[in-house]
Amino acid sequence: RFAGLQLTAQYSFKTDSKDDASFKDGAQHYSGDEGTSHAQRYASIGLSGEYGPASFAVGYELTKYGVNEATMADGNDGYGRQMDKDGQLVFLGGSYDFEVVQVFAEAQYFKHQTAAGGYELGSTDFGPVRVDPTDPSNSIGGSLGLKGYGLHLGAAAPLGAGTLTAGLYYVDFSEEFTEEPDADAKYYGVSARYNYPLSERTSLYAGAGYGQTKDDDTGNKDQLTQVYCGLVHTF
């Protein structure tokens, strides 16, 4: 840390040590041996700073997709690399404490991702269905991944003896294909959470959230509502 700034760098030789490069449970897996180019790898670098009531963070993330090495019973080889392009994401965010309320904001841009806005590659819920005739469970073929941007705006304010935190989320993205039109979709989300301290080390919390992903072309929607509560104790 220097002059309020902190630089952070990360690298993973395999993002999931328990994953492999086989065909099992009705799905392809795309992560070979750790330390090889067949494993899914991850790297990131970020810069953050704190200056009184203001703070910020900016960063870049890179995903090197792995390879499926499975040999099918009929002699067909595995499906190769999950995606030919590397996944990339950049983000910029910050917060400011106005004493009566703390405001948060973040924006990000991404491309060649496998998931965004509640949608995952291979899902048949949005856009045209792309199915591999040799394996109906594999509908990723020909995809260049998800591309788009996301925005987040949130705030935290004291309420009674506790703190209320709320947030709004928006993602505009599309799944790009090599030989077919893009499948466009949008995600909208809202959440709220209340934290009530029982002591210096123990607190109760309760919250709720709602999210909706909508396909622009077909109008199909996928909605999720959640309500939760719990207790936190710090030892």
Q: Which functions belong to the PLM regions below?
A:
Residues S44-G189:
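Detector for outer-membrane/organellar transmembrane beta-barrel domains
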Residues Q223-F235:
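Outer-membrane beta-barrel "beta-signal"
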Residues V190-G209:
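C-terminal closing repeat unit and adjoining cap/tail of repeat-based domains
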Residues K14-A39, Y65-Q82, A115, S174-E176, ...:
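Surface-exposed loop and membrane-interface regions of Gram-negative outer-membrane beta-barrel proteins
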Residues T8-S12, A57-E61, E106-Q108, G167-Y169, ...:
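Transmembrane beta-strands of outer-membrane beta-barrel proteins
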Residues R1-K18, A39, L47-S55:
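Outer membrane beta-barrel
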Residues Q88, Q212, L224-T225:
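Extracytoplasmic/periplasmic mature domains of Sec-exported, cell-envelope-associated bacterial proteins
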Residues R1-G4, P53, G160-A161, L198-R201:
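Short loop/turn motifs that connect adjacent beta-strands in outer-membrane beta-barrel proteins
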